[in-house]
From Swiss-Prot:
Topology in the lipid bilayer: Multi-pass membrane protein
This protein's name: Protein Tra
Source organism of the structure: Streptomyces lividans
GO CC entries: plasma membrane
Domain FtsK as annotated: residue spans: 275-465
Chain sites annotated for binding ATP: 290-297
Length: 621
């Protein structure tokens, strides 16, 4: 009963204190002066009234001087009396009676008549009038006594100092006494439950409240609890329409779990609410966003290690910034320069089309194997790759073909996002700037195809909506409120809860220490490299050795420079001819030709034709 009656007792005491604060000697003196002035004004008004009556009786002429003077004096006396009465009321308001005196007067108004009725009409009325009055008096006193009780909140010893303070303020007795101060009157909490993820309490709402309106008061609730500004607080609808649930994330169910390093099959992270491991299955197109310093690179490396570990898996890393790509060169195909990025995306598209033709009837995905492995394509950073594709092409000349169409980079990646899942070519797109504007790091066509969406700490709620959808704010996907570094949210379906996840931390040194694994390249046959038109079937650089054995070194695939030299040796004399023979884009051919010219392995004649130097002083015909 104490929490229920606490607001009444608090208001009673507040009014009593207000009245006592006004009962000062100055206000008492003003009241006495006002009472004296009012008594004098009443006496004057009574005298003026009697004089007017006498003048009216003495003369029948209403316009006589005596009657007019008496009438004017009476009117002035009455006006003065009214003014004195107004001043008296103001003085009484400034020096009010005590609340106890008012309570006695109020109860006397019903107790005295009730006692008289009971005494005079006992046989007819019975004892109920006086009994009812006594019950009202007893209820008033009991409400004050119970409402003023200070309930001691039992707090578990294992709670931290912050949790103990929050538990005390979430207790119904404290909440009911202070809710009115924060505009939360009509709400009352239930005893707090301590869970592995923090403190949880259910709030009962009266008819003035809806869960959505209560949620909108999150600032007032935080102030009432005295909670830290950076403490994660969740408010949502309860099990019934008149209830809401407050959750304070003072704890993490992932505390004490070691998430450093990586081993095959290890979870990507641990749910801080449930404590369950979070697995990200291979073969899922994925978006990973996180502002600078959020731990995006450290959190992503475990996924890349898993995607390059097995015999039927290969990894491609596209990193224009170079920093991440160089760590994976011993177990992934890396593309750093714009020419390399265009080459690898061209190869991936060709590989995709070839695989799609191999899918048998009745199946929707190609079966992966060491010969046809799943290829995970990791894009880091998305904004840089998009900027690459917007680079202005250099115009060609008669001798130099100019730059290739760099916009083909994004065309290839969009094609892979739309069509390559069935070919087991999986795109993982990472960016620090998850926006879709001109300088953003997400392409709308690619984003539309992604089903797994992860975000570490972001800058704004708008970025959270871009990553998780337009309902992110409504459903609680507030990645912009996550702490840094290494805490993420993962939305992999409509029923997934927005729980923070402590992700695995994998350092660059850990990546470099990983064992070598086969590197994927779309290899061509010697006839194709020499100028034949028919493409050779896909061959991997090497096979994966058994797990118990050290993997064998891969057979080195011919480089673009070697292919260009071989094509020139077979009779190709211009850059355009070499590009046609080798299937390499013209920009990469021009780059390789320049390297061969600088090394003296190829000569350019006056008419611009190319030839290979076979021996000292000799040129191939």
């Amino acid at each position: 009963m104490a929490p229920t009656l606490a607001p009444f007792a608090a208001r009673w005491d507040a009014e009593a204190d207000r009245r006592m604060a006004l009962r000062t000697p100055e206000h008492l003196k003003a009241l006495m002066d006002a009472q004296k002035g009012y008594n004098s004004a009443r006496s004057t008004a009574a005298t003026a009234k009697s004089q007017r009556t006498a003048a009216r009786a003495a003369s029948k002429n209403p316009l006589s001087t005596v009657r007019r003077a008496a009438r004017t004096a009476d009117k002035a006396a009455r006006t003065h009396r009214d003014q004195a009465k107004t001043k008296l009321k103001a003085a009484r308001k400034d020096y009010p009676a005590t609340l106890r005196a008012r309570a006695v007067q109020a109860h006397a108004m019903h107790a005295v008549p009730g006692a008289g009725i009971s005494a005079l009409g006992w046989d007819q009325a019975g004892a109920w009038p006086v009994a009812g009055s006594l019950a009202l008096i007893a209820a008033n006193v009991a409400a004050l006594v119970i409402g003023r009780r200070k309930v001691a909140v039992a707090v578990a010893d294992e709670l931290s100092a912050e949790e103990r303070r929050l538990v005390e303020r979430l207790d119904p007795s404290y909440w009911a006494q202070h809710a009115d101060e924060r505009g939360l009157v009509g709400t009352v909490t239930t005893p707090v439950q301590v869970t592995p993820a923090g403190l949880v309490t259910t709030v009962r709402l009266d008819g003035r409240w809806k869960p959505s309106a209560f949620k909108a008061k999150h600032e007032e609730i935080r102030a009432l609890l005295g909670a830290r500004t950076d403490l994660r607080m969740e408010i949502k609808a309860g099990s019934h329409g008149d209830r809401a649930v407050i959750t304070l994330r003072t704890r993490s169910a992932a505390d004490g779990i070691d998430l450093t390093g990586w081993t095959p099959g290890a979870p990507w992270g641990v749910d801080t609410v449930t404590g369950e491991p979070v697995q990200v299955p291979l073969g899922r197109r994925m978006l990973i966003a996180g502002t600078s310093g959020s731990g995006k690179s450290w959190s992503t490396r475990a996924l890349l290690a898993e995607g390059s570990e097995y015999a039927d898996h290969r990894l491609v890393v596209v990193d224009p910034k170079r920093v991440e790509a160089i760590n994976w060169q011993h177990r992934a195909r890396t593309a750093i320069s714009i020419e390399d990025v265009l080459d690898v995306t061209d190869e991936l598209v060709e590989e995709m089309h070839e695989r799609l033709e191999l899918i048998p009837r009745g199946q929707d995905v190609i079966q992966i194997s060491p010969e046809r492995p799943r290829i995970t394509v990791f894009i880091d950073e998305g904004a840089e790759v998009i900027a690459m594709a917007k680079k202005t092409r250099a115009k060609g000349s008669k001798e130099e073909p100019g730059d290739p169409d760099w916009s083909r980079i994004m065309e290839n990646l969009s094609t892979l996002a739309r069509m390559a899942r069935a070919a087991e070519i999986i795109l993982i797109w990472a960016t620090q700037k998850p926006t879709m504007d001109a300088k953003g790091g997400i392409d709308p066509q690619i984003s539309a195809q992604i089903t797994y969406r992860a975000a570490l700490a972001l800058s704004t709620s708008g970025e959270s909506r871009v990553v998780f959808g337009e309902d992110a704010t409504e459903k609680g996907w507030h990645a912009h409120e996550l702490p840094m570094p290494g805490v993420a949210m993962l939305r992999s379906g409509p029923k997934v809860q927005p729980h923070p996840i402590n992700t695995r931390a994998f350092s660059p040194a850990d990546v470099i220490a990983l064992p070598d694994r086969p590197v994927w390249r779309r290899q061509e046959s010697p006839a194709r490299s020499a100028g034949a038109s028919a493409p050779a079937p896909l061959r991997l650089v090497k096979e994966t050795a058994p797990a118990a054995e050290v993997p064998a070194q891969p057979t080195k695939a011919p480089t673009n420079r070697e292919k260009v030299a071989a094509a020139i040796g077979t009779g190709a004399t211009t850059v355009a001819d070499v590009a046609t023979v080798t299937g390499i884009n013209k920009g990469s051919v021009s780059k390789a030709v320049k390297q061969l010219l600088d090394a003296g392995e190829v000569l350019r004649s006056e008419d611009g034709s190319l030839s290979v130097v076979t021996q000292v002083g000799e040129v191939s015909a």
